[in-house]
Amino acid sequence: MSAIRLGTRASTLATTQSEMVAGLLRSEGLDVNLTTITTHGDTSTASLAAMGGIGVFASAIRAALLEGEADIAVHSFKDLPTGRPLGLAIGAVPARADPRDALVARDGLTLHDLPQEASVGTGSPRRAAQLLAVRPDLTIVDIRGNVDTRLGRVKGLGRYAKNGGKEDLDAVVLAASGLARLGHSGAVTEFLDPSVVLPAPAQGALAVECRTADSRHGKLAKALARIDDRRTRLAATAERAVLSHLEAGCAAPIGALAQLKPVSGKSLQVLTLDVVVAAVDGSRTVREQVSVELPAEVEPALAAAHTLGVTAAEELLDDGAADVADLKASGSTR
């Protein structure tokens, strides 16, 4: 079997994540080489929301897969559109890292301790909305750039950015998983509890995408199956079903986190899903929690996880989420 070509963005975080997956596949006996692909999201200076959010980093990489320029690709699952082009499949979802958001603030401050009207940088409407829900006094600053550039915007942390940072913000909020993968967990001043800020659906998880035929047969398919983590795939399936049912993209102010726990005295497990929709100014939020006992078999369990996400989305709509954000159901189950 010839070497597997793994398509990746050129950013440090993307290549780090791709190397992590390449290492897993190499441990399964595959020869894997990274192939760098430039995306519109990498070259544009517009905000993520202005670019549409949905699939801005994925489209070029998916095209490379379909055109045979790459064999697999590694995505941050939270950035991947819920709709999938014909001919592509999620071949593996490795074990998830910390799904929480993390605050990096000057002087070791926490969210509670930030001064009145403190400036907090984020490119995520979801993060901004939930931050304003608990701290309406904050000044939210829309930021772009790689992780190091964003860290360098914090006062006193300019050393993180290449050639020095602007140091013009009191804090930034980033995914804890990305900071950890780059070795920057030490910069975190507070891991934001999901009861305060729910993460993006599938945050902390990676998705290994491949051509559909390659996900079913051969050495690559077998290796992908072995690095797939059932717990992570189940959680991500439920969380992303919320986005799909609400026809929302990765830039929508929607948070979701699913957790799998055993049932005492039973062989079954319960999947609990917490979801939130927040007004962009933080003035109103709608939260729901739903649970389901999962069957032991893989496919029925995945179907139940998807249905759980749809149920959560319907409950959000029932409680007025469409009035909070521009949302609609792709189809009602009730």
Swiss-Prot record:
It is an enzyme of class 2 (transferase). Its cofactor is dipyrromethane. Binds 1 dipyrromethane group covalently. GO terms for biological process: protoporphyrinogen IX biosynthetic process. Keywords: Porphyrin biosynthesis, Transferase. InterPro entries: HemC, Porphobilin_deaminase_cofac_BS, Porphobilin_deaminase_N, Porphobilinogen_deaminase_C, Porphobilinogen_deaminase_C_sf. It catalyses: 4 porphobilinogen + H2O = hydroxymethylbilane + 4 NH4(+). Pfam families: Porphobil_deam, Porphobil_deamC. It comes from the Bacteria. GO terms for cellular component: cytoplasm. PROSITE patterns: PORPHOBILINOGEN_DEAM (PS00533). Tetrapolymerization of the monopyrrole PBG into the hydroxymethylbilane pre-uroporphyrinogen in several discrete steps. Monomer. HAMAP family: Porphobil_deam. This is Porphobilinogen deaminase. It comes from Cutibacterium acnes (strain DSM 16379 / KPA171202) (Propionibacterium acnes). The gene is hemC.
